[in-house]
A protein has these predicted regions:
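Structured C-terminal cap/extension of enzyme domains
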Residues: 2-173
């Protein structure tokens, strides 16, 4: 389990981060996530990938005098889940049917995954960085030729060539 989804949910700039700040400006999104996990029955250990002193101090503060979530706070978490679900995303299931027909051998589900992360978590810069490290230049979204072979194979009827253009605008410039 990754309660902060590799740090994406802890982003103060995301819709969830802004909502949590409106509920309690003194508590970080990461703290909310860790308190939720620690309040679950049967949890014995929680690992946190921390990248700076602030995160270490925030985690220590969260667990120093730990209090499980209250019913009201579970309502706050439920609202966070709804905020994430309400974000319009490309409904890709990563079935990979689209890749078989792609003459450019694009990793279409991977590109869509990165694109969706920018929509869901307000993580454009980090997604762009990881995209450029994980997707080789010769198979990036900008290499889509718009043939739509992929769209014929997609059981979700996603307009993949349009999404590749949008992803290219976000990541390949």
């Amino acid at each position: 389990m990754e309660p902060t989804k590799g740090g994406l949910l802890a982003s103060e700039d995301s819709a969830v981060g802004k909502y949590l700040r409106s509920v309690d400006p003194d508590v970080s999104a990461a703290s909310w996530a860790f308190r939720w996990v620690a309040s679950l029955e049967g949890i014995k250990y929680i690992l946190s990938g921390m990248g700076n002193t602030y995160q270490v101090e925030d985690n220590a503060k969260t667990f120093k005098n730990f209090k499980p979530l209250t019913e009201e706070e579970y309502g706050v978490i439920a609202r966070c889940v709804q905020i994430i679900r309400d974000v319009p995303r490309v409904p890709c299931t990563e079935c990979r049917y689209c890749t078989a027909g792609c003459p450019m051998s694009l990793p279409i589900p991977t590109i869509i995954k990165f694109y969706n992360e920018t929509l869901t978590y307000a993580a454009e810069e980090s997604s762009k960085y990881v995209y450029k490290r994980r997707v080789p230049a010769d198979v990036r979204a900008s290499n889509c030729i718009g043939c739509k072979n992929c769209e014929e194979q997609c059981p979700q009827h996603i307009k993949i060539s349009d999404i590749m253009k949008l992803a290219s605008e976000k990541f390949d410039n």
